[in-house]
């Protein structure tokens, strides 16, 4: 795939790109993370890549590979790769997923990209990760919907994804019938991590998939009695003058408005608890307003430099939010928020590209984070940051992934079971 041309600052000032040209450039350059930066054998998404050299033995990210499937759809639709190339890459990914070590049909957080063997995330987290697996299936189910032609290659792709989807035992993660899902399980440690999945956070997609599953579904009551019965679920308090329907104070990191909603369309989506478009728009507005107010007086923050979410810092990976502000801006926070705050996101995009330029722009798009206060610019790109940039910009531009996911029969049935209302269900 030919590399998009990077231009000098003087060239950009003399001949600035239009909004559409800039979106094209950023999506396409970021796509390279999942195309050229993927594992060389399986094509699954590496957890992270570096600006110039790659670390040996970097594990693949299961959730990031779900975003990779979405990126392949966008790349195919926009003509960066052919339909046949995208099919072949997905087939290679499925080759690894089919032979990988999984646990009651669920995958670990990290695994080897050649053998599919589990790479432990921590001492006790050496087995299934229900949320990472959910992000994987969100992408694979979109791919199953997109590759819909009645030709042998696409029929086989759909069958293979369908088999993985049917074999995922969501019900196992109720621990014998509890009214809540549990995040982790392993053969050696069982449920020792003991992390119940309760809202509000990035895990709405997990409950939706668990209720929608074709074979090992869980009852809808788990959504209401487990997910929604948390002290951090209902909020309805103002922050930065904006009411936040759900979630922790200040809304938490912005990826909460992105991960579940790369496929799940929040426009017009309601249930008894919230209007999810309002939730995500208001969360974004709070994050933006906080960065503009900049109570810590960090250098660089402002109307064209904002966005707090999980990402790399000089001291490691951290979940940035208004109540955990380290002076680090993560470009994915603003760029994946185009559907919710297009004007503010475009201002940030232009500043990132035109003003900060090569300090944060590289072979796979924007690096994971930067701090002008500390004069620090990340050397890394992360799958779970790059993926939502591509997916959410595409949803802003065309709604492609939202249309695919919301048209899936099992998902429509699951939304109805949970009591959701959506224009897609009319």
Label each region the model flagged.
Residues 2-426:
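Ser/Thr/Asn(+Pro)-rich, low-complexity disordered segments
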């Amino acid at each position: 795939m030919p590399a998009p041309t990077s231009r000098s600052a003087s060239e950009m000032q003399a001949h600035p790109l239009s909004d559409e040209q800039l979106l094209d450039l950023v999506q396409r350059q970021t796509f390279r993370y999942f195309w050229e930066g993927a594992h060389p054998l399986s094509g699954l998404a590496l957890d992270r890549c570096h600006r110039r050299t790659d670390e040996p033995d970097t594990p693949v990210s299961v959730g990031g590979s779900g975003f990779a499937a979405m990126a392949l759809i966008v790349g195919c639709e926009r003509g960066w790769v052919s339909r046949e190339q995208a099919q072949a890459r997905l087939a290679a990914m499925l080759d690894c997923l089919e032979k990988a070590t999984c646990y009651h049909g669920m995958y670990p957080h990290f695994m080897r990209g050649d053998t599919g063997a589990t790479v432990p995330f921590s001492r006790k987290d050496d087995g299934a990760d229900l949320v990472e697996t959910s992000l994987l299936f969100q992408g694979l189910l979109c791919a199953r919907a997109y590759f819909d032609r009645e030709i042998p290659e696409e029929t086989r792709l759909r069958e293979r994804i369908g088999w993985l989807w049917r074999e995922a035992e969501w019900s196992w993660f109720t621990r014998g019938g509890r009214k809540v899902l549990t995040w982790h399980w392993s053969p050696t440690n069982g449920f020792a991590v003991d992390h119940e999945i309760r809202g509000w956070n990035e895990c709405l997609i997990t409950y939706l998939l668990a209720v929608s599953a074709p074979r090992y579904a869980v009852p809808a009551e788990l959504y209401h009695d487990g997910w929604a019965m948390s002290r951090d679920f209902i909020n309805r308090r103002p922050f930065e003058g904006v009411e936040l329907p759900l979630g922790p104070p200040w809304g938490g990191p912005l990826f909460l408005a992105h991960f579940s909603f790369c496929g799940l369309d929040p426009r017009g989506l309601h249930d008894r608890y919230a209007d999810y478009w309002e939730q995500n728009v208001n969360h974004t507005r709070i994050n933006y307003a906080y960065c503009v107010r900049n109570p810590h007086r960090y250098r660089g923050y402002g109307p064209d430099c904002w966005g707090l979410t999980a990402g790399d810092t000089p001291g490691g990976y951290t979940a940035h939010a208004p109540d955990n502000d380290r002076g680090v801006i993560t470009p994915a926070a603003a760029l994946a928020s185009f559907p919710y705050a297009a004007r503010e996101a475009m201002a940030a995009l232009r500043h990132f590209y035109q003003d900060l330029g090569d300090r944060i722009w590289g072979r796979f798009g924007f690096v994971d984070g930067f701090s002008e206060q500390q004069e620090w610019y990340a050397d890394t790109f992360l799958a779970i940051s790059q993926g939502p940039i591509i997916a959410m910009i595409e949803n802003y531009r065309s709604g492609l992934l939202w249309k695919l996911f919301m048209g899936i029969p099992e998902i429509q049935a699951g939304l109805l079971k949970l009591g959701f209302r959506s224009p897609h269900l009319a």
